[in-house]
């Protein structure tokens, strides 16, 4: 599949997902499953599940908020969004744990 065809297919999925098509949203999430795994790698099982769930919510919100008119490719946009979401999640988890220890 050419890069242009991939992006065109993805753009159509995003439009459908924004319109409420659950199958399109599931297809998008499946496409980005390797990214979810990469971001959760190295975490304990309990943390992994929490982070994975929060990243999925952020992904859904990100699809709805994405505006291709801004000229950003969706893969770049969603990678950045999920990366920073994970950073903030881990910071909150660490703060919560430090409060529990004290």
List the predicted regions and their residue ranges:
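Alpha-helical promoter-recognition and RNA polymerase-docking modules of transcription initiation factors
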Residues: 1-95
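Internal acidic/polar
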Residues: 96-102
């Amino acid at each position: 599949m050419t890069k242009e065809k991939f992006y065109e297919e993805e753009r159509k999925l995003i439009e459908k997902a924004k319109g409420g098509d659950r199958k399109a949203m599931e297809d998008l999430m499946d496409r980005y499953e390797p990214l979810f795994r990469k971001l959760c790698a190295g975490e304990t099982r309990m943390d992994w599940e929490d982070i994975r769930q929060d990243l999925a919510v952020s992904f859904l919100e990100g699809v709805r908020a994405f505006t291709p008119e801004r000229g950003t490719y969706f893969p770049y946009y969603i990678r950045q969004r999920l990366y920073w979401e994970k950073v903030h999640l881990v910071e909150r988890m660490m703060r919560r744990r430090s409060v529990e220890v004290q």
